[in-house]
Amino acid sequence: MQLDSIDTALQALKKGESIIVVDDENRENEGDLVAVTEWMNDNTVNFMATYGKGLICAPISNAIAEKLDLNPMVTHNSDVYGTQFTVSVDHIQTTTGISADERTMTARALIDEQATGSDFNKPGHLFPLIAQDNGVLSRRGHTEASVDLAKLTGAKPAALICEIMDEDGTMAKGASLEAFKETHGLVMISIEDLEKYRKSSISKLDAKAKVKMPTEYGNFDMYGFTTDNSEEDIVVIANGDINKTENVRIHSACLTGDIFHSQRCDCGEQLAASMKYIAEHGGMILYLPQEGRGIGLINKLKAYELIEQGYDTVSANIALGFEEDLRDYQNAAQILKYFGVDSVNLLSNNPKKFESLESYGIHIAKRIELIVPTNAYNQDYMDTKKEKMGHLI
């Protein structure tokens, strides 16, 4: 099968064109038409319905789904591939909701920054799908691929997809997809190539310094790294001989907690507990510049303002226009590989860290729980991390 490059696909999507995305022959082994919602043209839905002939769905990020109160279609998902359908929707200004124009209206409303859940009738004729946060590095499906492509074009994380069917009603595969591509002059890529593209875009890492660092917890070696995807530096402290399997804490910088000992969070206490553990048992702490789960210090303070008005730590980030957690651990995985570490005993309560590291080739040999005392100021925060973010506390 003749495939195009990911860069060619991104250029086509930015022009408002649909492309073909094929998945693994050992998975669904299908081709989907994909368009980015923000860039799509007025004929996109009609083209998909006329020539694709499959179910037109609208992959979106989890943040959009939460913002619009789009709940799962079913309580217990038994789909063999775990596709995360939400309840179907029509925009409230549609009539029947099924026409190409009205499904286009509904799709565009999903990415309207002013839209709320009350702007949609449920059920409807457009089927949102929730993509996993780390895209094809977590799940190699068309849902994640289309949202990854949207992000890579600089658009909001939303797309339209539609399976391509043959004239006889069976799913188009192989030669049929190639013929479809030629007939309609479309770009065609694979999810496998998209996954490789994302992994190959990992930043350049440079080790700049190494010093001895005595602390109240013990003596450490401190390393300084720079990357080409951040203006902020990364610090690593290590104790003992570094082995292929290592005790590791990946800690996101928290000025308020780590430096000013804020009681709004548990970050400072987790850092202290990690340093004590590494001082006693050996290992490494990677200190990443990911303030406020990636939204930055000022936005974190704005989130605190919303929390004082009754929001929780997740809904506050979403209200500011962010996903609940923007962090990615590519740089952490690179640093571990720099030290020859490919397997870790991870000091963490956050399952997303496990998933992200494993997607970058770091094996999680064991989880070391990191439980610290709560207080009257951070109890709601801790409850939200457990109930909404799945933290193991």
UniProtKB/Swiss-Prot annotation:
Binding positions (Zn(2+)): 254, 265, 267
Pathway: Cofactor biosynthesis; riboflavin biosynthesis; 2-hydroxy-3-oxobutyl phosphate from D-ribulose 5-phosphate: step 1/1; Cofactor biosynthesis; riboflavin biosynthesis; 5-amino-6-(D-ribitylamino)uracil from GTP: step 1/4
GO biological-process terms attached to the record: riboflavin biosynthetic process
Requisite cofactors: Mg(2+); Mn(2+); Zn(2+)
Short name of one Pfam family: GTP_cyclohydro2
One GO molecular-function entry: GTP cyclohydrolase II activity
TM region positions: none
InterPro entries the UniProt entry points to: DHBP_synth_RibB-like_a/b_dom, DHBP_synthase_RibB, GTP_cyclohydro_II, RibA, RibA-like_sf, Riboflavin_synth_RibBA
GO cellular component: cytosol
Residues reported in the UniProt entry to bind Mg(2+) 1: 28
Function as written in the Swiss-Prot or TrEMBL entry: Catalyzes the conversion of D-ribulose 5-phosphate to formate and 3,4-dihydroxy-2-butanone 4-phosphate. Catalyzes the conversion of GTP to 2,5-diamino-6-ribosylamino-4(3H)-pyrimidinone 5'-phosphate (DARP), formate and pyrophosphate.
Family: In the N-terminal section; belongs to the DHBP synthase family. In the C-terminal section; belongs to the GTP cyclohydrolase II family.
Listed name of the protein: Riboflavin biosynthesis protein RibBA
UniProt lineage: Bacteria, Bacillati, Bacillota, Bacilli, Bacillales
